[in-house]
Amino acid sequence: MLFATMRQILFAVLALAFAPLAHAQAPWPDAAPDQWVMAHVDVETTGLDPARHEMIDIGLIYTDLAGAELGRLYVRIMPDHPERIDEGARRVNGFDVDYWRAHGAVGEAEAVRQIVEFHHRMRGEKRVIFTAFNAGFDLSFTRALFAQHGVSWNDLYFYHILDIPSMAWGQGLTALNATELSRDLGITDETRVAIEHTGITGAAFNVSVYRALLARRPH
């Protein structure tokens, strides 16, 4: 009898402990799509290693689940260590210190402030799904930047992330390359002109791919 009573108490305590978590997770997007927002994110960096390299810009376009744009933000960022630029990265994004200074680059702390302010303005009380083409790359750099300035990535975005090539893969489009995928979908590829290839052009491309994939789904 004592064992049964203790077990009942334990179950009751666990139920109370996990009730807030269960409430926080519901409702899911299929049940309440109007309670969710997608953050289409793309970043440009000085290299591939977030422990050494830094973001030089970020583009964010927030949409509803149907792909309708809610707002966008572009921030050009002056890295603390521009001398660490990888030449492969420079060929992709055209990073140049003088050009960045002349075109409104801000420091990392100010960039984080703008991103967080925009995020809260766009989301309201809704949950936000981090969405990107190269999701692991964009996630690792945004997480690193936020952490350096006292902001938790987990406080901003839902724990599931969406990567666009996986969405395409599920529809039989197995080209992981953006140029090939844009060809398969019949949409315009992102510019490959280095100085014009920015976080916001990447985010806009991601949104166009997402919308094209939605249009292919059976209704």
Where do the model's predicted regions map?
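Short alpha-helix plus adjacent loop in nuclease-associated cores
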Residues: 160-175
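Catalytic phosphate/metal-binding cores of nucleic-acid and nucleotide-processing enzymes, i.e., regions
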Residues: 140, 150-154, 169
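Acidic, Mg2+-coordinating catalytic module of metal-dependent nucleases/exonucleases
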Residues: 129-136, 140-146, 177-219
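Bacterial N-terminal signal peptides that target proteins for export
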Residues: 1-10
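Conserved non-catalytic scaffold segment of RNase H-like nuclease domains
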Residues: 29-39, 46-135, 184, 191, ...
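Cleavable N-terminal signal peptides
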Residues: 11-12, 22
